[in-house]
Amino acid sequence: MTEKKYIVALDQGTTSSRAVVMDHDANIVSVSQREFEQIYPKPGWVEHDPMEIWASQSSTLVEVLAKADISSDQIAAIGITNQRETAIVWERETGKPIYNAIVWQCRRTADICEQLKRNGLEDYIRDNTGLVVDPYFSGTKVKWILDHVEGSRERAKRGELLFGTVDTWLIWKMTQGRVHVTDYTNASRTMLFNIHDLDWDEKMLDVLDIPRAMLPQVRKSSEVYGQTNIGGKGGTRIPIAGIAGDQQAALFGQLCVKEGMAKNTYGTGCFMLMNTGEKAVKSENGLLTTIACGPSGEVNYALEGAVFMAGASIQWLRDEMKLISDAFDSEYFATKVKDTNGVYVVPAFTGLGAPYWDPYARGAIFGLTRGVNSNHIIRATLESIAYQTRDVLEAMQADSGIRLHALRVDGGAVANNFLMQFQSDILGTRVERPEVREVTALGAAYLAGLAVGYWQNLDELQEKAVIEREFRPGIETTERNYRYSGWKKAVQRAMAWEEHDK
């Protein structure tokens, strides 16, 4: 009898590293998770220690196998999914980072972005990389590191330094420095990659003065990139066979592989992606054109809207405001009041993402009167997640010409029934919540499993996808539009708050 085989997905997120073991029926067998430190050197700056990312991720891998009581030779393949855009530069020789990882949320490169705009590069960047000029993406972060770490640019030119997003860093560590790769989805988030030619963009490298020698090789999202030797029982060499940025992995995990299918992930931020097939749709409404995974991990395109603060705004209620002791409490308190009593919370703590793209917006609470209590503020914070999602969906429908009939949802916050119902109410659209919540890990597992023949094709996976609950709109159109217009007014007042030259 042959031993039962499994797939392991490594899900390296913004606040924690996770490892998930899945069986052939796409059931979750075991999960391990470790949080790691968020470093805030200055207001608006966010960093991670790359060695801590690696330590937390590698320990979850060992832990999850022990929990599931399986040996490494029972693993058919490993898939990796990761927080995107976060930039790491390290020494080829030692594997030691020359600076902390600059996280996607970090706004320190706003000045570099302003310079790119002044130099008239916005259209070039949008047309060729699919992105808008914003500190969010990796390119300006790499430039910042090379500008600020003495001698680093010369070392990079000599091939002594390497750049990677988190997937690249993990694979480098897992293969003891033998493999320096990324996939198309992660490359498409750097602002250095031409999404039409599917190669690094020479003009962008030139503009940001980033030596090509430090960049990884770019490959498909579903293929064998290299082998890793896991300790634990057996010490077998296991193929690393899938890579996708977290949002593209979630899109694949939701099996949104046909044109016009969309999902929204509610994590630290909120990310809506709509598959546009083999056509790169240029957005006229502040969305990104990005690379997604087709049915067998090949290049498809997608429209994406990124909201920076979703789950993070609930953490703010918990950690900074001390209004709740646990994120799960937010639903309980939000339903203690019948509405927000006219309050809107705009959680623009690090600026606003799609479709506004204003790095100078700041968080604000509007509509406060004497009768407002903490429950109203908690409810308004939850509602802000749904309003921001509607902002993105309206832009997406305008760009694609596709009217969405159902939105597939995933991520931590989808367990909040109040939020999901309000989301359906404010969109006027069905919201579908899947049985398996770990769709980001699922996507990485699917990509890896398909690459090694663990699963034959998507048809085999389709029957495993079960919708656990469907939410339908429960308010009238006039009420929906009235509430949304209040949100739009609040957003306008929060914009352009911070001074540019500070």
From Swiss-Prot:
Tell me the organism's taxonomic lineage: Bacteria, Pseudomonadati, Pseudomonadota, Gammaproteobacteria, Enterobacterales
Name the enzyme's class.
Answer: transferase
Q: Which HAMAP family match?
A: Glycerol_kin
Q: What is this protein called?
A: Glycerol kinase
Task: Report a single Gene Ontology molecular function.
Answer: glycerol kinase activity
Q: Which residues bind glycerol?
A: R84, E85, Y136, D246, Q247
Give me the segments passing through the membrane.
none
One GO CC annotation: cytosol
